[in-house]
């Protein structure tokens, strides 16, 4: 209607006052409306601006009545819709703020049960790390970071994407925490304290057994030591039985000789057995030689015995110095020396003969080895010569095969081929007979054909 009629329309003062009055909003919106006054809707402003202020006439009032009714209806509808929309918008905004505050409050302050579970996890992780460090195993930090990253991932995704879950979903998300049994299974099936103690006990036992084996490997067993001492004491007892008593000076020299090889063996960290020591010295003395030479026999037999052997020797010498045994020894010395003199000469001869035999055997072996090496060298030289000759023959054959086609090509190149020019006449030469034949004239050659 307003578009069809171009006549000026004026509103009465009562209607203009009602339009200018502010609609009373709720208490929450009043503060915002005080700061920002609510403007009138756009169609109402346009109508007011377009309407001129003039004194209406009777004819104009008749035509303006339908237009006034339409404008009043439109402005009333707009004014009713605006506060409703504002209220709905504010209610939604308040709900969103409340949800955000609840989420932040729940995210910052977990319940006491959740805190206790979180502390329990940390304590278990610390205990497991300490146990692994004690056992020589260090957990990788990447696994821990991944485990923590998996827990933080959903919360960070929700905050980053702006997704705000409802309070019920948050409570369910926070309330879902694994029980201690599930935690133990997730952390790699941690051993119970009893099993851990057993595992540590086994490791300690293994270490102790290894240390004992090392100690035993360096030091001979007590049984071996006793046998070794028994072997050393036997010649001394034989000497006492024969009545020979070494002088104190010889004993001191004997002890000095014993201590020197012991120091050397300790410095090297290896103790040779009595047989190895005898081989190292290059002398193997029989028990009869030990009877005749008590000082040398004791030095050769007791080199690896240590302080225990020296103590036994001292005891034996102390026992031999008793007054009752001294007389018996003095009486038996004459008979013993006379009987052992020929035995020593025979033994020396045997030892010398053995040494000579060993030297001869060594020389024979060396000669045999030299002969074998020379024969092998000869055989290898012959084989090399044969191979070289074969290769030379093969090369000669190949050269001949290659040179034959080259000779044929050279012969063909030596015979020139003359091509006559277009203005020249080629001289036809008769064929020359081979050596020893004479050519007849052409007439005589044609006669036999006729």
From Swiss-Prot:
Cite the post-translational modification comment.
Substrate of transglutaminase. Specific glutamines or lysines are cross-linked to keratins, desmoplakin and to inter involucrin molecules.
Alphabetical list of Pfam families matching this protein: Involucrin2 (PF06994), Involucrin_N (PF10583)
Is Repeat found in the keyword set? Answer: yes
Q: Where is the composition biased (Polar residues)?
A: 1-19
Give the main location: cytoplasm
Region feature (Disordered):
1-43, 77-370, 422-450
Q: Which GO terms describe its cellular component?
A: cornified envelope; cytoplasm
User: Which spans does this entry mark as compositional bias, Low complexity?
Assistant: 120-135, 295-344
> Keywords in UniProt for this one?
Cytoplasm, Keratinization, Repeat
Q: Which GO terms describe its biological process?
A: keratinization
Where does it reside?
Cytoplasm
PROSITE patterns documented for this protein = INVOLUCRIN
**Tissue specificity of this protein:** Keratinocytes of epidermis and other stratified squamous epithelia.
Family per UniProt? Answer: Belongs to the involucrin family.
Tell me how this protein assembles: Directly or indirectly cross-linked to cornifelin (CNFN).
Q: What does this protein do?
A: Part of the insoluble cornified cell envelope (CE) of stratified squamous epithelia.
Its name, as the record gives it, is Involucrin
Gene of origin?
IVL
